[in-house]
Design a protein with these regions (language model features):
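Short beta-strand-centered aromatic/proline hotspots
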Residues: 20-34
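Exposed regions on extracellular, virion, or secretory-pathway luminal proteins
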Residues: 30-38, 54-55
Length: 89
């Protein structure tokens, strides 16, 4: 998990539509305020995501989405390791 992502950082997350790892780039950082469903603030990032695996050549732009900061990873391997860890418990 990335503790302090910055705008412009390339990150990995699980796509909510395909459940597959996706390369993205942070475009903005925001906080979802507390409300009746979530009584605490939830920091998140607006992310452009790409159809590639190399940050130096990310491939075609596929879209934009928002992702909770707790769900962002620096590398694809870190993301895959976190999935393996959560499924073995």
């Amino acid at each position: 998990m990335i503790m302090n992502p910055k705008i412009g950082d390339y990150i990995w997350f699980i796509c909510r539509w395909t459940d597959l790892p996706v390369l993205g780039q942070v475009t903005s950082l925001k906080i979802d305020p507390a409300n009746k469903n979530f009584p605490y603030e939830r920091p998140y990032a607006e992310v452009d995501w790409y159809n590639g695996e190399n940050p130096s050549e990310p491939g075609p732009w596929c879209g934009s989405t928002s992702v909770l900061l707790k769900d962002l990873y620096k590398t694809k391997q870190e993301l895959l390791d976190s999935i393996k860890f959560s499924t073995t418990q």
